[in-house]
Structure formats: structure tokens, C-alpha cells
């Protein structure tokens, strides 16, 4: 083939293009997804860490004075503008944490606590850290170091549900005995038929289940499956009773016109016991995390803490998703700290709230108290490796070199942030993951 010869068909096509069409300007729009940052040199120094280019280290290059205005309070809270603006792709989040200082007192550095924070991909304002300190103090030059880690988010199918054994979940449910009794009764009344069953008591709800009807599936292949999906939102749960029988919980009694299709299969992917969005609030595209609402009223005494359990659990056998719990910036400013932690598989969702104020605090049912972050396994080295529920303000140490990764974005500094950073819906509103 002679590459220098004109293709006859192409020549004929070109002849059909009119002169007017050739004069129409061609408009090409494009965007490059990058991890951009801009730094205000007046007060702060920022550089990319050599061991892991997903990490930015920010240090103060001038003295910072912190004044405790309320001497009656044990902890003073304030926000500190660290002079950095970032723009990252929508499938990433920036996690803010203080770097560990092995011996701060020998260098005359006061003990300052920094709340972990999440910065959404759509936020374009200056990043602010929430600080806690017990007395007025002066932070010397280079006395405060903060890391901004570029963390990849996971995108699992959130409609996937998991089958759990009745014996595994009943001991942990608040309604355990009633739930178990209802399932056993339904299996006995089902008599080998798959049909919706009303509670024998006639009370309208099967005790402990929140369901108006239960249906038994007498099929050993279903019982061998691990996951299921269904577009029918009437399905509250599917529980494996034994090796040959599973029970579906139906929120309302189905009518003759209703058709329910359930796909059962075996997988190692992320799946929840209860519908995901019955526990977590849907988020915008630019948001990193899913809000978690208080399951009931919570009363927190002064300088106290409490741990609450939310009836939701998950499995992820392939370890592709690492669910993490973080606090909210608005809660931090009120002196209410959510201890950052990993949500462990096959465990109920537990959240520890600490009240660092001298006042009793009431949290109402439905108030947003925490956030769920679904982290991709490739970013596992950038989050706490264990489920430490004792440290309110986790710090990060020396970077560990990541394994070989292809296509991971790296930080790039820009002097034209407003021009190069792609537009976002949120822009400058609030700070943290969901704003104040």
C-alpha cells in the first residue's frame, strides 16, 4: 500500500464539503483531570513528599499565636487557614491530618491537636484546619506540619446486598429475640411454599423485623449464594435460615399486580445487609463522603464520650473497598469529635462521639453526625492501618512508598489556579467535606 497516494473515496467525500462548511469555526472543549495546588507563600511552605507523590507537606514559615479566649473551657477551638487551595478529580478526596512529632516539647513546640478533615473535589477555597489547644501558646516557625493526602475513592455497586446467616446477626440486633422468633415462625408456617405470610398475631408487623410480610425461599442454591440485587425497594432483607431455606422481609404486603425479581449470586465485592441508602444519605457528585444521621436522640455529658451502634453491616471479600468513618467540620467546631476509624467487615457500624465542651449536648435523631468514606484499596497506605477507637486526633508518620501504580495522578503546583482549576458547583462555599 502506498501511503502517499490519496484515497479515492476520501477525495470524493471532500468534494461534497461546501466552502461555507469549511469556514465554520471548529470549537473543541476539553479538560485535564489533575491534582492541582496553589500555595500562599506568606506564612506557609508546601512541597510534594519524595517517598509518595500523592502527599503534600505543609509547614508554617512564620510564628503563629493562639489565644485562649475562654479560660473556663478545657479546650479552645479555632480554625487556621493553611494557605493552600486544591483541585482534584471527582473520584478523589484530600485527607488532612497532622504529622506526628516524636518530641515536640524538646523543641519548645506546644501540644496542638488537629482534627482530621476531608476536602471535596469541588472545593476551591483556602483549606482550613480545626485546631484544639488547652492554653494560649505560640507555635514557632516550622512547628506545625500538616499532610494533605490524595486518596482514591472506590465506586462499588451500592445496590448490592448480602445474605447473612440468622445465627450470625441475631445476637447483635437490638430486636434479636423477636427477629429470630419471627423468622422461625415464618419458616414453620411457609410449609414449603413461597408466598407472602402475614404475622399470626394479626398485629400488622412481624415482631422485630419492621416488615408486614415474610416470604420463604426453599432453595439450596439460593442459600449457597452470598449476594443479591433487586430493583424492588419493598425487600427489606434476605436472611439465610439454614442450608436450604432463606427468608425475605417485605416492608408492605405485595398485591397481585406486583412482580418481584431477585438475582442471587456469589461474589467477593462490597455489599451491605440493609439497603445502603437507608443508612447513608445520597451525595452529590463532587462530595467525597456519605452523611450518617443519628439513629436516635443522643445526650452527651460534659467532657464525655459515647459509642453508638447502627444496624448496618457489610462484606467485601476482595478487599477492594475500605470503608472509613470521619467526623464533620461543623461538629468539630462545636467541640464534638467523631473518632476516625475503619468500619470492619462483618461488624455493625459503630461510631464514637466525644464531647470536649463543659456543657451537656443534645443530638437529635436525624442530625448529621459523621461521614462514611469508601476508599479504594490502592490508597490503603494513606489511611490509618488499624481500627483505633481511642485517638480523637490521629496523626500520620513517615510516608511509606506505595506499590507500583499506573495512572495515579500526582500533585502539580500552579501559579494560575483560578485559570487551570476546572469549574465546580461548590466553589468556595464551606470547608471540609460538606461545609459548615
Swiss-Prot record:
Lineage start: Viruses, Duplodnaviria, Heunggongvirae, Peploviricota, Herviviricetes
Keyword Hydrolase: yes
Pfam family of the protein (one): dUTPase
Positions that bind substrate: 328-330, 431-432
Gene giving rise to this polypeptide: DUT
Family: Belongs to the dUTPase family.
EC number: 3.6.1.23
InterPro entries tied to this protein: dUTPase-like, dUTPase-like_sf, HSV_DUT
Biological function: Involved in nucleotide metabolism: produces dUMP, the immediate precursor of thymidine nucleotides and decreases the intracellular concentration of dUTP to avoid uracil incorporation into viral DNA.
Keyword Hydrolase: yes
Coiled-coil spans in chain: none
Swiss-Prot/TrEMBL cofactor(s): Mg(2+)
Name this polypeptide is given: Deoxyuridine 5'-triphosphate nucleotidohydrolase
GO molecular function: dUTP diphosphatase activity; metal ion binding
Top-rank taxon, per record: Viruses
A single GO BP: dUTP metabolic process
Record keywords: Hydrolase, Magnesium, Metal-binding, Nucleotide metabolism
Catalytic reactions of this protein: dUTP + H2O = dUMP + diphosphate + H(+)
Amino acid at each position: 500500500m502506498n501511503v502517499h497516494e490519496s484515497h479515492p473515496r476520501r477525495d470524493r467525500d471532500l468534494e461534497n464539503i461546501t466552502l461555507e462548511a469549511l469556514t465554520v469555526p471548529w470549537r473543541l472543549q476539553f479538560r485535564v483531570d489533575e491534582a492541582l495546588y496553589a500555595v500562599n507563600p506568606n506564612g506557609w511552605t508546601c512541597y510534594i513528599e519524595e517517598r509518595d507523590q500523592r502527599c503534600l507537606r505543609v509547614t508554617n514559615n512564620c510564628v503563629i499565636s493562639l489565644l485562649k479566649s475562654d479560660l473556663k473551657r478545657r479546650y479552645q477551638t479555632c480554625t487556621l487557614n493553611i494557605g493552600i487551595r486544591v483541585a482534584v478529580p471527582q473520584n478523589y478526596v484530600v485527607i488532612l491530618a497532622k504529622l506526628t512529632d516524636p518530641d515536640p516539647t524538646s523543641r519548645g513546640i506546644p501540644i496542638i491537636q488537629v482534627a482530621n478533615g476531608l476536602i471535596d473535589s469541588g472545593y476551591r477555597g483556602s483549606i482550613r484546619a480545626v485546631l484544639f489547644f488547652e492554653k494560649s501558646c505560640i507555635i514557632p516557625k516550622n512547628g506545625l506540619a500538616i499532610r494533605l493526602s490524595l486518596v482514591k475513592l472506590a465506586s462499588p455497586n451500592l445496590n448490592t446486598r448480602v445474605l447473612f446467616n440468622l445465627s450470625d446477626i441475631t445476637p447483635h440486633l437490638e430486636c434479636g429475640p423477636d427477629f429470630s422468633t419471627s423468622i422461625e415462625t415464618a419458616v414453620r408456617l411457609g410449609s414449603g411454599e413461597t408466598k407472602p405470610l402475614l404475622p399470626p398475631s394479626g398485629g400488622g408487623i412481624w415482631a422485630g423485623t419492621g416488615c408486614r410480610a415474610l416470604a420463604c425461599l426453599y432453595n439450596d442454591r439460593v442459600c449457597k449464594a452470598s449476594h443479591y440485587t433487586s430493583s424492588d425497594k419493598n425487600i427489606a432483607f434476605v436472611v439465610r435460615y439454614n442450608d436450604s431455606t432463606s427468608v425475605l422481609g417485605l416492608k408492605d404486603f405485595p398485591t397481585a399486580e406486583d412482580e418481584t425479581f431477585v438475582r442471587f449470586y456469589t461474589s467477593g465485592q462490597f455489599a451491605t445487609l440493609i439497603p445502603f441508602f437507608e443508612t447513608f444519605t445520597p451525595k452529590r457528585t463532587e462530595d467525597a463522603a456519605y452523611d450518617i444521621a443519628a439513629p436516635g436522640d443522643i445526650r452527651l455529658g460534659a467532657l464525655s464520650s459515647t459509642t453508638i451502634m447502627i444496624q448496618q453491616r457489610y462484606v467485601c471479600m476482595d478487599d477492594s473497598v475500605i470503608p472509613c468513618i470521619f467526623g464533620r467540620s461543623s461538629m468539630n467546631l462545636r467541640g464534638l469529635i467523631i473518632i476516625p476509624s475503619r468500619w470492619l467487615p462483618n461488624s455493625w457500624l459503630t461510631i464514637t462521639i466525644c464531647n470536649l465542651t463543659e456543657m451537656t449536648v443534645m443530638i437529635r435523631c436525624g442530625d448529621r453526625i459523621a461521614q462514611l468514606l469508601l476508599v479504594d484499596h490502592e490508597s490503603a497506605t494513606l489511611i490509618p492501618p488499624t481500627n483505633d477507637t481511642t485517638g480523637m486526633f490521629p496523626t500520620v508518620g513517615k510516608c511509606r512508598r506505595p506499590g507500583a501504580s499506573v495512572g495515579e495522578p500526582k500533585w502539580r503546583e500552579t501559579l494560575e489556579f483560578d485559570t487551570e482549576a476546572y469549574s465546580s458547583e461548590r466553589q468556595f462555599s464551606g470547608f471540609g467535606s460538606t461545609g459548615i
